[in-house]
């Protein structure tokens, strides 16, 4: 085998170190810095000739800097004769701009996919894309992992008396249904109307939640406005408790204030993005899952088998 190396972008150093610890391999050395005008400079500090290389870099805030850094690292590795380059992107930025939702707007998720390929990325490994069709924006393999396995273990450890799964909106029904099926639980739907960006008005509950411990499932939590309003609606319908599982803890704007003052009892997120500690937030690591996927990709083994 050619051997492989793992490098970290500045947004995911701790995440990459955890992956390397699981795989018992050293983290690759790269000198990443910024010039005084903000331009990013990258130098790969060890040979990668003929190696399969994995770059670990989430492209959350600051999204533009982290995305550009990933592309520049890719170019540096390509010019250093790496055999293949896999972008391990725990959080795929710009995924919410996946279609023309209004006149004269871009499809930025597709533009970003084009940039990945143009830079020289051969494969992408990510988790819980906001829209599954983004995989079709690429002409290279894309492994979209599911955070549900990690949430499943944690929820089982809670020994909830009467659990039920909820989708926080109509668009998330497929994700919630998949989770409910894995857990062997029933499902309800929170029906809401989004009036404008980062604001949501909960309209009603489809299904019975009285006396249930409700578990909302979503791909991300941003300002937490949707989650908190949904929790209020669920409790108004008689839910005993409400927790939410969201793979990506974006947690921008008034997110922490919303959580502090809202009816949501617990928010469970993963470490695809860094987050500030909060009494209502539980952070679960998905680095071991990514480590196993990296191992399987390198050895040409099935990734899908992890989720069957």
Functional labels for PLM-detected ranges:
Residues 1-308:
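PRPP-associated nucleotide enzymes
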């Amino acid at each position: 085998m050619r051997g492989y190396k793992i490098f970290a972008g500045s947004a995911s150093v701790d995440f990459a170190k955890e992956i390397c610890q699981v795989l018992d391999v050293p983290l690759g050395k790269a000198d990443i810095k910024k010039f005084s005008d903000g331009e990013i400079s990258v130098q790969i500090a060890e040979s990668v000739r003929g190696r399969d290389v994995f770059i670990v870099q989430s492209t959350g805030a600051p999204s533009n800097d982290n995305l550009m850094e990933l592309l520049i690292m890719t170019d540096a590795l390509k010019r250093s004769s790496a055999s293949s380059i896999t972008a391990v992107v725990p959080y795929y930025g710009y995924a919410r701009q996946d279609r023309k939702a209004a006149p004269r707007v871009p499809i930025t998720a597709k533009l970003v996919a084009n940039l990945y390929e143009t830079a020289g990325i051969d494969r992408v490994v990510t988790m819980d894309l906001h829209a599954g069709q983004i995989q079709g924006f690429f002409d290279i393999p894309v492994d979209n992992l599911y955070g549900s396995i990690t949430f499943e273990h944690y929820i089982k450890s809670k020994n909830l008396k009467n659990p039920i799964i909820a989708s926080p909106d109509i668009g998330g029904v497929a994700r919630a249904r998949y989770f409910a099926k894995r857990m062997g639980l029933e499902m309800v739907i929170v029906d809401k109307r989004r009036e404008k960006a980062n604001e949501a008005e909960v309209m009603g509950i489809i299904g019975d939640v009285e006396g249930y411990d409700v578990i909302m499932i979503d791909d991300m939590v941003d300002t937490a406005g949707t989650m908190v309003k949904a929790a209020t609606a669920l409790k108004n319908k008689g839910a005993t408790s409400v927790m939410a599982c969201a793979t990506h803890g974006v947690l921008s704007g008034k997110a922490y204030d919303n959580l502090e003052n809202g009816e949501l009892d617990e928010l469970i997120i993963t470490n695809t993005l860094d987050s500030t500690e909060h009494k209502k937030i539980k952070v679960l690591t998905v680095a071991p899952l990514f480590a196993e996927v990296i191992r399987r990709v390198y050895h040409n083994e099935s990734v899908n088998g992890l989720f069957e």
